[in-house]
A protein has these predicted regions:
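Terminal-appendage/accessory-domain detector
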Residues: 1-240
Length: 240
């Protein structure tokens, strides 16, 4: 939104500075403000073997701009009625993460009408966290406190997964890819497309790679996407 164009910036750092390396990749199909909290819930759930049934309350602390978008007003955020509602509801994202160990695109269809998930949403609270506010806007951080009969379990995630400083592993990136293309491409074509994209710098015919991305006409029965999951018992990857 500069008042005038600056032609010099078009070639500034050309060939030496790669802006794409500064781009984050969202592991979850929800508002980015929710991601640090989802990471924290995944980490605590794995480390403490927390089951959704034992959760009395989850308190998520957010920077104020994020809280206004995904935490307020609390009654509405605890009762999402559509996919967009769910994407911008910290309560819904947290409830799904508690129940599944993550959040994938198919979870909206599975959980928006699920009574147990919606009941769990009522136990998710949000607040403005001073520490997260101090880290903002450099980071979109979050604090998480899960209260159970066994006690309280807390964590603070400063850099959410997917940021350049905490990027997805190769397997996590592939899991996101599979979750998105799974309903539209057969496995063999998805594998070929993934190989083509990863070797794009060596491609002689970019059109051949793009043609692999054309969806086929599939049967009416949807295929569930793999999504981005934290398998129970697998070591969680985190750099905080």
């Amino acid at each position: 939104y500069a008042p005038a164009a600056d032609a010099a910036k078009v070639v500034d750092g050309l060939g030496t500075r790669w802006e794409t390396l500064k781009i984050a990749v969202k592991p979850y199909p929800s508002c980015r403000y929710s991601h640090a909290a989802i990471d924290g819930i995944r980490d605590l759930g794995h480390a403490q073997a927390i089951s959704p049934e034992e959760v009395k309350e989850v308190m998520v602390g957010l920077p104020e701009p994020g809280w206004k978008i995904i935490g307020d007003p609390e009654p509405a955020k605890q009762s999402p009625a559509s996919v967009v509602d769910g994407q911008f509801s910290m309560a819904f994202c947290a409830a799904v993460a508690l129940r599944t160990g993550g959040l994938a695109w198919d979870d909206y269809a599975r959980h928006l009408g699920d009574r147990d998930t919606l009941a769990l949403c009522k136990r998710i609270r949000t607040r403005i966290d001073p520490k997260a506010q101090a880290d903002f806007p450099a980071e979109m951080s979050a604090s998480v406190c899960i209260t159970t009969a066994r006690g309280e379990f807390e964590t603070y995630v400063r850099v959410p997964k997917g940021e350049p400083a905490n990027f997805l592993t190769a397997s996590e990136l592939r899991a996101k890819f599979d979750g998105l293309v799974g309903p539209y491409l057969p496995r063999e074509r998805a594998d070929a497309l993934a190989r083509g994209l990863l070797a794009l710098d060596k491609a002689r015919d970019i059109g051949a790679v793009l043609r692999l991305a054309s969806p086929e006409v599939r049967s009416a029965e949807p295929r569930l996407a793999a999504g981005f999951r934290l398998a129970r018992g697998r070591q969680a990857n985190s750099t905080r």
